[in-house]
Amino acid sequence: QLPSIFSHYTTPKGGFILHQYLFFIGSFPVRAYGLLFMLGIISSGLTAYYIMKRDGRGWHVHIFDFTMYCGLAGIVGGRLWDVFFFDWAYYQHHLTEIPYVWQGGMAIQGGLLFGAIAGILYTKHYHIDTWAFGDLLAPAIILGQSIGRMANLMNGDAFGHPTGGNFGIVYPETTLAYQTYSSQPLWPAEVWEGQIDVLVFVVLLFYSSFPHKKGQVFSLYVMLYAIERFFLEFLRGDYVNLTMGLKSAQMTSVIAFVIAFVVFLYLQFKGTTDTEDKAQA
């Protein structure tokens, strides 16, 4: 019998527990993490395709290749970021496990950085306006991130620290969350991040419907996600390494916000509106 995605468990309030494995093909496990992670990439690509087709500049024909290249770069970047910035204490003794991305352990910030680099190189190669392309892409990216956080939930990583009460998420014994905090209820940090990502998605679509300078939608996306991630890190319990009193993800968020804010203001005064460029095209 194949395991269901959810099964009941007993707590003071009742609830459900999450399965890392959806089913097995022979001895090969099909992980909920990998399935949802790929679903996030596919959903992001389809959303970008729809937005760009409506835009009318023909950029939608690039989405398949663009998603493939940026998705692969994002996987590499997300894995390396997690290994070297979050879990090096473990991986320095288990080097052969670094390529095992299907087991979980991906840092969104590293994935976004490597994906952005790949995206810039792609747009430059095909002579596509990078800022305008990024503005159209931003809502699709944050939507994919939201689904990615559900992958973290199913895998029991990117978890919160104990709530101190009888409310929260209790993870299965096979997860890192359980190995770290046992059966203590934990803050649903990854769930809330996924939900806030959806709100950011709506905000970006709303903002992009009004006249704006090229690059401002993407800059706004970076600022909003940086704010979101900075504060949610106070609830995260999967790592505690601090630099100047802040976690590494918070330091990265501060840097990303400052850069995006400066770029946003610069574009406001020195940039050109996307509608002007479309009219000239």
Predicted regions and their residues:
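A feature for loop-to-transmembrane-helix boundaries and adjacent hydrophobic helices
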Residues: 3-281
